[in-house]
């Protein structure tokens, strides 16, 4: 085989692989509900608006990483805000002898 043909086949294979990976990623994304139309019955419109609200909640939800786990937040709050010892708190600059 010619080196040029092997290069083209490798490039084509990589592009096909990349398209397959992108296709797999898009399957996990929720599908927007279809609008039933203006003259649809009230029940269908209610179902549509419920599905639309669910869709919007899915695509706009906050995604938290490992740093935002509740255990770490509880630890930070207890360490930073709820300390009982005062030796690490900043001292006041108030000096009664100046007054």
UniProtKB/Swiss-Prot annotation:
Residues 1-28 form the signal peptide. GO terms for biological process: feeding behavior; negative regulation of adenylate cyclase-activating adrenergic receptor signaling pathway; neuropeptide signaling pathway; positive regulation of circadian sleep/wake cycle, sleep; positive regulation of feeding behavior. The keyword Ribonucleoprotein does not apply. The modification Tyrosine amide is found at residue 64. One of its GO terms (cellular component) is extracellular space. It is found in: Secreted. One of its GO terms (molecular function) is type 2 neuropeptide Y receptor binding. Keywords: Amidation, Cleavage on pair of basic residues, Neuropeptide, Secreted, Signal. Belongs to the NPY family. NPY is implicated in the control of feeding and in secretion of gonadotrophin-release hormone. This is Pro-neuropeptide Y. The gene is npy.
């Amino acid at each position: 085989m010619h080196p040029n043909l092997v290069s083209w086949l490798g490039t084509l294979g990589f592009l096909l692989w990349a398209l397959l990976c992108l296709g797999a990623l898009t399957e996990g994304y929720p599908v927007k509900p279809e609008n039933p139309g203006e003259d649809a019955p009230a029940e269908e419109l209610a179902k549509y608006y419920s599905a639309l609200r669910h869709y919007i909640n899915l695509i706009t939800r906050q995604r938290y990483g490992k740093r935002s786990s509740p255990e770490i937040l509880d630890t930070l709050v207890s360490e930073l805000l709820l300390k009982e010892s005062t030796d690490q708190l900043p001292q006041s600059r108030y000096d009664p002898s100046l007054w």
